[in-house]
Amino acid sequence: MFLMLPVVVTDAETKDEAGEVLCINTFGAFIRGEGGFGGDRGPSGPKNVPPERAPDEVVEMQTLPQQAAIYRLSGDRNPLHIDPNFAKMAGYDQPILHGLCSFGHVARAVIQKYCGGDSDRLKVLDVRFSGVVFPGDKIITEMWKESDSQIILQAKTQRGEVVLSNAAATIAA
């Protein structure tokens, strides 16, 4: 699937005391509300729609009010996650939590409920970021077991806003 949005790519190097590069984190940020590149949008990805029944598992995880500041240590210096004025310019009332942090909470919920705590068993976690999580929000992950290897899921906040949708996890035996 192709997204017709501009992307800003940033590399952040983590070095030891001697200046030796330990790792390089590469971040991509989509610029919302921009685009206009023309052409066909292209095909959509698979539709992982929750079934019309109660979830088989629900995990609630509380984020911390300072979570974005802590998560910034990963090297993601996007001011959208820390600067209230920048967040307002982007159309938010306050800074938003990193999508990767929200994704991590959801991955942890799947690993906890369907992988016996073994992260090696989570082979694929496919999601669409569809809303925002604010630092201090509760992330509620709802999961439906479709088979031993396939879990359909979605995540929402305590406000009821779906923040990760069209989501599925593939689990190894």
Report the location of each language-model feature.
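Hydrophobic beta-strand-centered segment that forms part of the acyl-chain substrate-binding groove
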Residues: 1, 104-150
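HotDog/MaoC-like acyl-thioester-processing domains
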Residues: 1-58, 135-136, 140-173
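Catalytic strand-loop segment that frames the active site of acyl-thioester-processing enzymes
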Residues: 27-97, 111
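A residue-level detector for conformationally permissive "hinge/kink" positions
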Residues: 83, 91, 123, 128, ...
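C-terminal accessory segment of soluble enzyme catalytic cores
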Residues: 89, 96-101, 126-129
